[in-house]
């Protein structure tokens, strides 16, 4: 039984079940990145929320989330494609959510069935960009299940990072 967390609504329901309500980002942010007490407020927020969610059922759920990828090269030895991967950022009423795998293997290879492999090889050889999505399946790491932080790109933008121990990876070709 998996909880599929790939759109704002499903992610918000998941966060509601874990932490009930979003933090008061403005209060935590205070006077911004240069506020000397910001790190301490974030640390306190994360520790308090960790303690409150201890033992909650969603910590045991198997979750599915997506990362994006672009095929980079074909390897004839494996019959598969290397790829460049990265997180998908989802805007929610809680803030921006970016799932964070505990460990991302650096050697992920997509090995499609032969007919698809040839189509993808031709597309790459023609200089076309080939995007796929990576469905990662796993469970939250209870001790660090959600990390609250702020964007380094946009002042005051709250970021929530569910930290997931990955159990399985599936590749989805976008058509």
Each model region followed by its residue ranges:
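OB-fold and OB-like single-stranded nucleic-acid-recognition modules
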Residues: 1-175
């Amino acid at each position: 039984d998996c909880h599929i967390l790939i759109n704002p609504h499903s992610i918000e329901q998941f966060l509601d079940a874990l932490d009930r309500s979003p933090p008061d980002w403005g209060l935590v942010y205070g006077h911004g990145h240069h506020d000397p007490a910001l790190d301490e407020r974030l640390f306190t927020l994360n520790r308090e929320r960790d303690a409150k969610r201890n033992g909650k059922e969603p910590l045991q759920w198997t979750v599915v989330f997506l990362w994006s990828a672009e095929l980079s090269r074909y390897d004839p030895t494996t019959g598969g494609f290397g790829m460049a991967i990265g997180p998908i950022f989802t805007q929610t009423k809680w803030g921006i959510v970016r799932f964070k795998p505990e460990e991302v293997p650096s050697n992920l290879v997509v090995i499609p069935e032969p007919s698809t492999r040839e189509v993808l090889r031709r597309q790459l050889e023609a200089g076309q960009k080939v995007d796929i999505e990576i469905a990662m399946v796993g469970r939250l790491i209870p001790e660090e299940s959600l990390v609250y932080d702020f964007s380094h790109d946009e002042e005051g933008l709250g970021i929530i990072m569910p930290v997931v121990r990955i159990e399985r990876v599936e590749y989805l070709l976008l058509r």
